[in-house]
């Protein structure tokens, strides 16, 4: 009986501390509940599995939203950081958490919405819709997925905002192209930013990475065909100009490297889909562009360079001067609004039966939204693959990206390595690549000059 009396709670007797604590908990729960009920539905679309493909027109003319948690942004990160290195990235994140640069605990206060399009990545708070930041696509150098125990992190390596100063390093930079010496002799290393997001699980992380990979693919393809359009159209209309641009007094010559950098500035990114649990590269991975590039670099990828060089060489040997001019006009019209069907029909008439295989070489330069129609047209006219002797080099291009769980991919969809991935680049490789392409296009212009001289 006495025990029952002891168990009876006397009304009103609650410690002040407990009362405040309970009130705060109830208030937070009520506030969180109100927020969750008031939140709008995300602007999203159905994706085709297993690659989470989305209609390219949506990314070009609309956008798609995904829910994430925003942990923060790290600035003044050395540009040579390998974003697919689990160890390096987690070490930075751990240090940032200790110094309170990044959130230590995941709460509903960090809920955010990431909006993806072919033009930028926008991040807003889930509640209130206030913009956190907006990153243009050409400022994104890489994206990677890293798992840390129960945390699923998606990390974007982006360009440092204007005004950011290079960081000092006592060691030589891992990449000579990214460092310079100050007057005092100290090494100045180019810097970048890391945007750190968290998602619910591995599937959500892979989906976000694959969507960004598609964005990269769209921009890469658009930029590549635009570059081809300008190169051929300019060469066809003014063949003596080639790729060398002279001033009016012909006293100075613009470096061809600058021309290519200006044209290729929008597709110099790498998309590391997953760093996963291991930093070792996939056995099936091929060498790709080094991970030591900053987002501000403007380099034409090796794959794009090879494709351009191959096609320009083929056109030079298979088409006459007049036909090259007609091709340039058709390509220019297609880039300015003509339908893919009209473009294919006109090219078919230009090439004829004996040279219809030339259409295969255009495959890498057809935007994703028109690729299916283009493939159907090739099959209709009896051109089904690119394994012939002439078109061997055209088969290197792959539209499908590797599985996000076992490899990294660069911006053009080719498989790439991770931490120890070997890749040859730097200035010599760049100069050689540009020289090869410029020689081909210059040869194209020279052949047109010779064809145009009356005998």
Curated annotation (Swiss-Prot):
Keyword Cytoplasm found: yes
PROSITE patterns the record matches: PID
Protein's UniProt name: Cerebral cavernous malformations protein 2 homolog
CDD domains: HHD_CCM2, PTB_CCM2
Description of its domains: The C-terminal region constitutes an independently folded domain that has structural similarity with the USH1C (harmonin) N-terminus, despite very low sequence similarity.
Statement: the UniProt record of this protein carries the keyword Aminoacyl-tRNA synthetase: no
GO annotations of cellular component type: cytoplasm
The PID domain, residue ranges: 60-247
Family: Belongs to the CCM2 family.
Gene: ccm2
InterPro entries: CCM2_C, Malcavernin, PH-like_dom_sf, PTB/PI_dom
Database matches in Gene3D superfamilies: 1.20.1160.20, Pleckstrin-homology domain (PH domain)/Phosphotyrosine-binding domain (PTB)
Composition-biased stretches (Polar residues): 400-412
Region (Harmonin homology domain): 292-385
Region (Disordered): 272-299, 399-432
Traits of the deletion mutant: The heart chambers in mutant animals are huge, constituted of a monolayered myocardium lined by endocardium.
UniProt keyword list: Cytoplasm, Developmental protein
Pfam families per the UniProt record, alphabetical: CCM2_C
Biological role stated in the UniProt entry: Component of the CCM signaling pathway which is a crucial regulator of heart and vessel formation and integrity. May act through the stabilization of endothelial cell junctions. May also function as a scaffold protein for MAP2K3-MAP3K3 signaling. Seems to play a major role in the modulation of MAP3K3-dependent p38 activation induced by hyperosmotic shock.
GO biological process, one term: heart contraction
Predominant place of localization: cytoplasm
Localisation per UniProt entry: Cytoplasm
Subunit note: Part of a complex with MAP2K3, MAP3K3 and RAC1. Binds RAC1 directly and independently of its nucleotide-bound state. Interacts with HEG1 and KRIT1; KRIT1 greatly facilitates the interaction with HEG1.
């Amino acid at each position: 009986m006495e025990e029952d009396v002891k168990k009876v709670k006397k009304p009103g007797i609650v410690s002040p501390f407990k009362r405040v604590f309970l009130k705060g908990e109830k208030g937070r729960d009520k506030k969180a509940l109100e927020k969750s009920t008031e939140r709008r539905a995300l602007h999203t679309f159905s994706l085709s599995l297993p690659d989470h493909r989305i209609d390219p027109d949506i990314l070009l003319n609309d956008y798609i939203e995904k829910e994430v948690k925003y942990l923060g942004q790290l600035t003044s990160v050395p540009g040579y950081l390998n974003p697919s290195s689990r160890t390096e990235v987690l070490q930075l994140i751990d240090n940032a958490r200790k110094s309170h640069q990044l959130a230590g605990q995941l709460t509903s206060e960090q809920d955010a919405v990431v909006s993806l399009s072919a033009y930028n990545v926008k991040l807003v708070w889930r509640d209130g819709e206030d913009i956190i930041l907006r990153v243009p696509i050409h400022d994104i150098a890489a994206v990677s997925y890293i798992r840390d125990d129960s945390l699923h992190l998606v990390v974007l390596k982006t360009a440092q905002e204007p005004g950011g100063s290079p960081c000092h390093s006592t060691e030589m930079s891992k990449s000579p192209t990214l460092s310079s010496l100050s007057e005092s002799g100290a090494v100045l290393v180019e810097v970048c930013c890391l945007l750190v997001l968290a998602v619910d699980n591995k599937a959500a992380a892979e989906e976000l990475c694959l969507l960004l990979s598609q964005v990269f693919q769209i921009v890469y393809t658009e930029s590549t065909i635009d570059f081809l359009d300008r190169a051929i159209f300019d060469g066809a209309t003014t063949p003596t100009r080639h790729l060398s641009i002279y001033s009016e007094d012909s006293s100075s010559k613009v470096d061809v490297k600058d021309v290519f950098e200006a044209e290729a500035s929008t597709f110099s990114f790498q998309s590391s889909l997953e760093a996963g649990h291991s930093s070792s590269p996939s056995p099936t991975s091929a060498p790709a562009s080094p991970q030591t590039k900053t987002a501000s670099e403007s380099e034409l990828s090796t794959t794009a360079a090879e494709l351009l060089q191959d096609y320009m060489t083929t056109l030079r040997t298979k088409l006459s001067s007049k036909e090259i001019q007609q091709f340039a006009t058709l390509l220019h019209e297609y880039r300015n609004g003509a339908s893919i069907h009209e473009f294919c029909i006109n090219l078919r008439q230009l090439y004829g039966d004996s040279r219809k295989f030339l259409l295969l070489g255009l495959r890498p330069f057809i935007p994703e939204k028109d690729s299916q129609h283009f493939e159907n047209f090739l099959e209709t006219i009896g051109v089904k693959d690119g394994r012939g002797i002439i078109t061997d080099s055209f088969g290197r291009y792959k539209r499908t990206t590797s599985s996000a769980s076992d490899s990294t991919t660069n911006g053009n969809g080719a498989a790439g390595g991770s931490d120890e991935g070997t890749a040859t680049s730097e200035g010599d490789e760049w100069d050689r690549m540009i020289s090869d392409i410029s020689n081909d296009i210059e040869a194209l212009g020279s052949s047109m000059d010779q064809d145009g001289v009356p005998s």
